[in-house]
UniProtKB/Swiss-Prot annotation:
Side Extracellular, residues: 1-23, 78-98, 157-193, 257-267
Residue ranges crossing the lipid bilayer per the database entry: 24-47, 56-77, 99-118, 138-156, 194-217, 234-256, 268-287
Disulfide bonds: C95-C187
Keyword Glycoprotein: yes
Topology of the protein relative to the lipid bilayer: Multi-pass membrane protein
Coiled-coil segments on the chain, per record: none
CDD domains documented for this protein: 7tmA_OR4A-like (cd15939)
InterPro entries the UniProt entry points to: GPCR_Rhodpsn (IPR000276), GPCR_Rhodpsn_7TM (IPR017452), Olfact_rcpt (IPR000725), Olfactory_Receptors (IPR050427)
Single GO MF annotation: olfactory receptor activity
Xref: Pfam families: 7tm_4
Superkingdom assignment: Eukaryota
Protein's name according to its UniProt entry: Olfactory receptor 4X1
Cellular localisation: Cell membrane
Length: 305
């Protein structure tokens, strides 16, 4: 099907039509986005420069932090810039590209979180075989699988939408291009595509969440036979990961597991998985991990790690 598009650009409603309020919101997003880039960037650089943070856990954490920067960068800079110039507009091609990129990095993050859960399972439940299983080749393969999974998810979410005609209206009640608000602008029957989106996005969010929770229940069951010191260290690492998982997957499930209808609350819910999770990632992982904190202090202090 060849799409006939009378719409060449899309206008975002955003959070508010009051420009004073919008400017305050844009300043808040600017501060949060700056913190996302600096915090996650510091984790990436610290791990790359460190001679101590060499375990697979930190290898995966560096990739997760890099993906968080990319994920947040898909929509935050444009939202901030548009708010200051008072023109919340994006081209149709730009909108579709933003939607594809958002789901690519979001899907990659979801798969990386599952990879990190598997890494913790092997480290805690099979410590004697950990380095043999999680060798350099396996770590590289798991990262490539995460990127590939994110790409397949994004293609599955957006390919059919790229074929739809858009003939008006062109006003989107959101602050970035996502599948639900984009489908509402299409001049065609989107029922079948909506089902595919629920199956793809919703199932990945829900299934991934329950698989991750199940893996941590297995770890908790295994830890009952460990001493208190070992339990505390393992639980501290797992608690950090579970917190990130909850902040990311619960809001995603609320948005993508239901029919493709945009609700006013979607904009607030979306803030959690597009900004809040990337913002809290460095706080959760660094503040609860003595090795990361010490490595950061040495790196910032200009010492050899």
């Amino acid at each position: 099907m060849v799409a006939t598009n009378n719409v060449t650009e899309i206008i975002f409603v955003g959070f508010s039509q009051n420009w004073s309020e919008q400017r305050v919101i844009s300043v808040m997003f600017l501060l949060m986005y700056t913190a996302v880039v600096l915090g996650n960037g510091l984790i990436v650089v610290t791990i790359l420069a460190s001679k101590v943070l060499t375990s697979p856990m930190y290898f995966f954490l560096s990739y997760l932090s890099f993906v968080e920067i990319c994920y947040c960068s898909v929509m935050a800079p444009k939202l901030i810039f548009d708010s200051f110039i008072k023109r919340k507009v994006i081209s149709l091609k730009g909108c579709l590209t933003q939607m594809f990129s958002l789901h690519f990095f979001g899907g990659t993050e979801a798969f990386l979180l599952m990879v990190m859960a598997y890494d913790r399972y092997v480290a805690i439940c099979k410590p004697l075989h950990y380095m043999a299983i999680m060798n350099q080749r396996m770590c590289g393969l798991l990262v490539r699988i995460a990127w590939g999974g994110g790409l397949l998810h994004s293609v599955g979410q957006t390919f059919l939408i790229f074929q739809l005609p858009f003939c008006g209206p062109n006003i989107m009640d959101h602050y970035f291009c996502d599948v639900h608000p984009v489908l509402e602008l299409a001049c065609a029957d989107t029922f079948f595509i909506s089902l595919l989106i629920i199956t793809n996005g919703g199932s990945i969010s829900v299934v991934s969440f329950f698989v991750l929770m199940a893996s941590y229940l297995i770890i908790l069951h295994f830890l009952r036979s460990h001493n208190l010191e070992g339990q505390h260290k393992a639980l501290s690492t797992c608690a950090s990961h579970v917190t990130v998982v909850d902040l990311f997957f619960i809001p995603c499930s609320l948005v993508y597991i239901r029919p493709c209808v945009t609700l006013p609350a979607d904009k607030i819910v979306a803030v959690f998985y597009t900004v809040v999770t990337p913002l809290l990632n460095p706080v959760i992982y660094s503040f609860r991990n003595a090795e990361v904190k010490n490595a950061m202090r040495r790196f910032i202090g200009g010492k050899v790690i």
